[in-house]
Regions:
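A glycosyltransferase accessory/donor-loop signature
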Residues: 57-58, 64, 69-206
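Short, mixed-charge, low-aromatic patches
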Residues: 5, 52-59
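GT-A fold catalytic core of metal-dependent nucleotide-sugar glycosyltransferases
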Residues: 1-40, 68-69, 75
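Generic hydrophobic, helix-prone segments enriched in Leu/Val/Ile
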Residues: 26, 46-49, 170-173
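Short, glycine/charged-enriched secondary-structure capping and boundary segments
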Residues: 16-18, 41-43, 82, 165
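Surface-exposed acidic, glycine/proline-enriched linker/cap segments
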Residues: 36-55
Length: 206
């Protein structure tokens, strides 16, 4: 399994680990943000696909923040050196995500959207996501009701903004950690105080 650091696991991760990939290289959730952008009137994302990615079916583009990886198959597609060489090429917007989509096209097992529910950053649910095909948008909206993994993709993070989408889920887990007070202090701009200096007399009396 590979997972980005800006997410919360809200379901049984063993279910994800046990995903049967067969001969496929990767298991992943379709990227509703990318797919929605394909249908935007400005045509920028569609043009990027044609000129840079050259994918046969860009609507199969997946989000690389949560991946089930068949490492044996990945090494058959490219050696580690080849993967790194490809990754060093310029011109990609989403770097590793773009490269994985291009090189693994046709080798993907698509997961239920609940395994990578991207939160509503900057109102994208009703400004980008809803431009995706109806079946894609409906599957995403259904996954929001029972997310197994919530992905805080984008600039709006619950540890910076407690009012962002799905922030309550993040903080419900944060409250179970021994450092929640420090997290709240950091979010509030409270700096850690310097350790107090011992008074000479107090030390002498010890």
């Amino acid at each position: 399994l590979y997972m980005d650091c800006d997410l919360v696991v809200n379901g049984d991760i063993a279910e994800l680990f046990d995903t049967e990939l067969g001969d496929h290289a990767i298991g992943a959730v379709p990227d509703i943000d990318f797919i929605g952008n394909l249908n935007m009137k400005n045509g920028e994302r569609a043009q990027y696909v044609r000129k840079q990615l050259h994918m046969r079916d860009a609507y199969g583009y997946f989000q690389a923040g949560v991946l089930v990886m068949n490492l044996e198959r990945m090494r058959e597609i490219h050696t580690v050196h080849e993967w790194l060489e490809i990754a060093s090429k310029p011109g990609y917007i989403y770097n590793d995500q773009d490269i994985l989509n291009v090189e693994c096209e046709g080798q993907v097992t698509y997961l239920d959207y609940s395994w990578n529910v991207m939160h509503n950053c900057a109102g994208r649910v009703n400004g980008v996501f809803d431009f995706a095909p109806a079946n894609v948008y409906q599957a995403y909206m259904a996954s929001r009701k029972a997310p197994k993994i919530v992905h805080y993709a984008g600039f709006d993070k619950p540890w910076k903004n407690p009012w962002c989408d799905f922030a309550s889920l993040y903080w419900s887990y944060a409250q179970e950690t021994p450092f929640v007070a420090q997290m709240v202090a950091a979010m509030s701009g409270v700096e850690r105080p310097a350790p107090p200096e011992h008074h000479e007399r107090a030390i002498a009396e010890d």
